[in-house]
Amino acid sequence: MYANKVKKIAAVHDLSGMGRVSLTVVIPILSSMGFQVCPLPTAVLSNHTQYPDFSFLDLTDEMPKIIAQWKKLNVQFDAIYTGYLGSPKQIQIVSDFINDFRHEDSLIV
C-alpha cells in the first residue's frame, strides 16, 4: 500500500478575479507544497473588496450541495482552511462542515 498519501486540504474561501487574494493564491501555493487543495467556494468576486467597487456572486446556496456530494464520496480532509465568509449563514454552514469532517488529527485554520 502507498504509505505517503497526498494530504487533502479543504479550502473554504472566495474566488476573486483581481487582487492576488483568496483561492487564486491559496490553491497554487498549497499545491506546490504537495497538498491536494479541494476548494469550497463561498463567493465569486470580480476583484477583492479593497477596491472601491466590485461584483459579488454569493454561493451560499451551493455550499451545502458541494458538502453533500463530498459526504457521498466519503472524502476525508487532513486540514480545513477557511477564509472569506460572506454572511452569518455561511459561518453556520462552515461550522457544521468542520464538525462533520474533522477528525482527531485535523488541522483547522
Each model region followed by its residue ranges:
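Ribokinase/PfkB-type carbohydrate-kinase core domain
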Residues: 3-11, 15-19, 25-109
